[in-house]
């Protein structure tokens, strides 16, 4: 138990002192990080955690990893008959899952692999999924999902996903 913890911030590092302990962490300027405009994300929509787990787990195994066709390195969300459909392919395998969740008619986004894996990791960390509150929103460039106290903001992959209905 320390009575006080001190943070000292400089341009290149953050020093943390508590009792006899001193930690120095490197710091990067905020201008080195991309600006993500989350103001224009549209309406937040609710989604049950069980539905999101199914959307990810049933299709993500077929997601490409470091493919030159960058649009395959993510999970494609779109709508079919008013329901959210998730599709992944690496060019050899294709997985498609039509959920029971209602989706926007214009929904057609590709969420990057790293964001999908992180969302899946967070969802799997909860022992009782019925207590998990989830809201998502998106625009043409950004996907935003809130899972209880977690907030994930990810750039979307640009490009057109292949027509998987012709396979």
Describe the predicted segments one by one.
Residues 1-167:
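Structural preference for solvent-exposed beta-strand-turn elements
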């Amino acid at each position: 138990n320390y009575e006080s913890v001190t943070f000292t911030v400089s341009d290149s590092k953050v020093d943390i002192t508590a009792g006899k302990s001193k930690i120095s962490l490197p710091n990067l300027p905020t201008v080195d990080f991309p600006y993500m405009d989350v103001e224009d994300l549209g309406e937040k929509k609710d989604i049950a955690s069980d539905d999101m787990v199914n959307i990810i787990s049933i299709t993500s195994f077929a997601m490409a990893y470091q493919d030159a066709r960058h649009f395959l390195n993510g999970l494609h969300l779109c709508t079919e008959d008013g329901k959210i459909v998730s599709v992944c392919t690496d060019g050899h395998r294709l997985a498609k899952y039509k959920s029971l969740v209602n989706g926007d008619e214009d929904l057609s986004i590709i969420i990057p692999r790293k964001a999908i894996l992180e969302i899946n990791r967070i969802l799997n960390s909860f022992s009782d999924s019925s207590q998990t509150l989830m809201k998502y929103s998106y625009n043409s460039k950004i996907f935003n999902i809130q899972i209880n106290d977690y907030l994930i903001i990810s750039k979307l992959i640009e490009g057109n996903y292949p027509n998987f209905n012709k396979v």
